[in-house]
């Protein structure tokens, strides 16, 4: 069975700076999941790809967005992508996803623990991925002539609904 990502995913990137903690949010992504179902429950997932336009991430502050897009090299790398390689369902109903994240043209293998709930016949996946910007060859952005520095540690949190 093929499921499609709902039109309004919730994707949040959180980090720190020398001035304050920050969040950037996107509600724009595309995705497809191929799996086996029993009733309305997924029993196996054979394929899952989610892509988010890099410039859909917004902080609500234009200057911060511009610095982030420059650091992410969005003029060259248009998307952030997750590509599933293997999925294992745990006895507690969670999943272990093994796959790759591609950010700023750099691809890294990741393992994610994902919580799945069924709401209104939709599979809702919630999880997060913490990483260092420098792992993806991203120089943490600075602002105000280098006086405000972004921390290297960031976290992507997501809620994805497939139907």
Please state what every model-predicted region is.
Residues 1-163:
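Low-complexity, acidic/polar, glycine-enriched regions of mature
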């Amino acid at each position: 069975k093929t499921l499609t990502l709902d039109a309004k995913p919730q994707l949040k990137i959180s980090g720190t700076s020398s001035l304050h903690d920050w969040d950037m949010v996107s509600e724009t992504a595309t995705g497809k999941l191929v799996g086996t179902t029993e009733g309305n429950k997924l029993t196996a997932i054979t394929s899952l790809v989610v892509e988010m336009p890099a410039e859909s991430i917004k902080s609500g502050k234009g200057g911060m967005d511009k610095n982030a897009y420059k650091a992410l090299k969005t003029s060259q790398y248009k998307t952030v992508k997750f590509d599933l390689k293997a999925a294992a369902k745990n006895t507690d109903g969670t999943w272990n996803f093994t796959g790759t994240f591609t950010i700023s043209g750099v691809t890294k293998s990741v393992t994610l623990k994902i919580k799945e709930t069924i709401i209104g016949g939709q599979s809702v996946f919630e999880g997060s991925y913490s990483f260092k910007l420098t792992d993806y060859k991203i120089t943490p952005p600075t602002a105000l002539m280098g006086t405000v520095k972004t921390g290297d540690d960031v976290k992507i949190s997501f809620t994805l609904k497939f139907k």
